[in-house]
Amino acid sequence: MATWLLIWETGYRVFGGEDSVGFPSPWSVIESFREGLFDGSFFSALAASLLRVGYGFGLALLIGVTLGLIIFSSRFGQWLLGPLVLGVQSLPSICWMPFAILWFGLNEKAILFIVLMGSVGSICIATRDGLTQVPNMYRRVAGTFGASKWQSLWWVFVPSAMPVFASGLKQGWSFAWRSLLAGELIKHVVGVGSQLDESRNNFEYPKMFATMFLIVIASVIVDKLVFGQFEKYVRSKWGN
């Protein structure tokens, strides 16, 4: 950590010191970060963003898993929805901003739509791939014991697909988080994305950098404490 601070401070002095534009010193960023923590602005912005992305990710999870099951269970669904989902997944979330504004206006629904479209494809593909990669031997054993299609799906396919699904879930979260940050640029709301853009517009570069660090820290914490632990649990129970 000290090495990175030294490199940063050296770069700050090389590029002009106090006269540099858009490249604040590490100490000014640390001070801005401290102020954001103590005045509560960082916590309120982060809480609003996490709540917002939670709604969008939950909706994406519901739709993505449903579409993944349809694609896996039906050849017609695979033919009709497979290429469409793959195409949606390949689009950067920022591409959905014009449609969100056109269809929903400048409001929370537009942000929710961007989060949904940014993450639903990843969850759908993870669901499909997890179910597809179940060994044929498991299918034959289930058939031998007389399991119905839905019994096989619930008791054989779903547990076997959980390790792949857990990895896809973590990836879907990362897409949802990045989509949220893009979506919060649409309208000035309480959130880390809007706070980042507001700092840029007001030339508050230390606060802008501090907000970026807040975003990174929050991303790492959620990834490690929530999805990392979930993935670890799934692999210990159903994986290898």
Give names to the regions the model predicted.
Residues 10, 53, 57-69, 73, ...:
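Hydrophobic positions within alpha-helical transmembrane segments of bacterial inner-membrane proteins
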Residues 14-58:
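Periplasmic/extracellular loop-to-transmembrane helix junction in inner-membrane transport proteins
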Residues 44, 48-52, 102-122, 161, ...:
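Loop-to-helix entry region at the N-terminal start of transmembrane alpha-helices
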Residues 66-102, 125-132, 140:
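Cytoplasmic-entry segments and transmembrane alpha-helices of multi-pass inner-membrane transporters
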Residues 113-117, 149-183, 206-210, 214:
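Transmembrane alpha-helices
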Residues 126-168, 192:
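Short cytoplasmic-facing helical segments at TM-TM junctions of multi-pass membrane proteins
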Residues 192-230:
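Hydrophobic alpha-helical transmembrane segments of polytopic membrane proteins
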Residues 228-240:
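Short cytosolic juxtamembrane segments of multi-pass membrane proteins
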